[in-house]
């Protein structure tokens, strides 16, 4: 009999920087779903990979003095090492620089062009390099990207466009007729009401301003933009447009595209429209999970709250990280991470609840039965509640996993763990052991605990697989299939248990946090932005830096981030427009001596003339900025050299 298939994907990650705990969350969740489906008898394909083209990759590689592919090869190695350390069981890793993907993408582009869904035009507007997104003037937030808040660049270039509006009504109808296509429900409503129903603009799908990308096969001046290149990985990985489409026929449509909420629009609007144009069935579901908030906010280097999963694995082991992410983050909503919560959860759930249950059970089998598993020959009514809960939990777990309710699954399993610990207190094995006539009853109690642990081990195997293996080793059981936990008899009497190390040693919370903070401080001191390429003294001499005094300062109308300064250059008054309104109130700058790039060519910003630029130092993500100040005794007009 053929197995049911299950195809699950993560986004392909953009390797312009190291992956962080948020990327890890997506991949761990996908891995848990993939492992569970394998456990329940499905033929699974779990796809992940890297999105390797684009202007940002090209720039980052250049900054490091590397060719893009050389830079990418190093990054991909580190990503694969991360997934190995997190025990990620992906079946295929796709890179958009793979030859088969490039060839397939070129064929997709050509097909869409030849059938009239793509046309050539000219793009003029604003571009965000980090997000690889184009924006119209009306969409900008004070000339910053509405998605990430970073500055955008004005661009004008010839481009190919995809006729999105042609398929919009058809997609709206599909979403409304297939309520499970976009999940959670709130995300579906957002896509319909905020993007689709107001109307779609045609989508720019090629670039000419950089060359690190897949060339349009019939127009080499253009490279194919991220939308077709990256999104199509879900079918090119299965052999679409190749001589062997066996995987495509077997696994498509995907059961779940798992993505972060920030890229849900691309996966629920752009991607399905492309599939409609290609005549390909849509994926069954796109699930947009929430963000991982660190200490109440998004991660950023300047805040010092970026969480490196490698550090956590090194200090606590991969299963602690997997457990916290899967249990504590509401699947579909934002969730919190901080070291204190994380360590306390290890101590309470993993060390106290699960670890102690195993340790006490194995220790008592060793102490009272020389390590040989007794037979359950003296049952009592008090056993039924534990046995029934153990058997019922299997069905509850399966039902919740069908609905992608991962935290609820772990809640059910930990309810069983709690009940088993309570059963020890109720049956008091240490008292039974004092009465030789109660030997059979003692053996039954310990068998029930051991069999419950075997069932727990199977139940947790998709979520914390290494821990599951360690439990099986100590119980010395090999019956670990999903079907085997439909009955309460998988542990065999006469088996010799093997006492091992504690699953999760208790951690001194304060000492460990102090250690992690110390490591982070050392790491931050080492990390500095790469120095730009050398210039000569002649190059530097071209820049005329002068001391100026701020005479007046006021906001620029209609621009939240701009200030209009009048400065004294030593007898000459100038007007300067500076993007520092979010860091300084106008009155804080008046009377201050600052440094001006005096020979910068004048330019108009928001209709106001700017005659120079104020020097300032900022963090990498622009969350903090300070002007370069000069002691008041230096006269205005003095040269800075």
UniProtKB/Swiss-Prot annotation:
Report what the protein is called: Methionine--tRNA ligase
Gene label: metG
Q: What is the lineage of its organism?
A: Bacteria, Bacillati, Bacillota, Clostridia, Eubacteriales
Record PROSITE patterns:
AA_TRNA_LIGASE_I (PS00178), TRBD (PS50886)
Q: What class of enzyme is it?
A: ligase
Ranges that cross the membrane? none
Pinpoint the tRNA-binding domain residues. 539-641
Cofactors, names only? Zn(2+)
What are the record keywords, sorted?
Aminoacyl-tRNA synthetase, ATP-binding, Cytoplasm, Ligase, Metal-binding, Nucleotide-binding, Protein biosynthesis, RNA-binding, tRNA-binding, Zinc
Sites where the protein binds Zn(2+): 128, 131, 145, 148
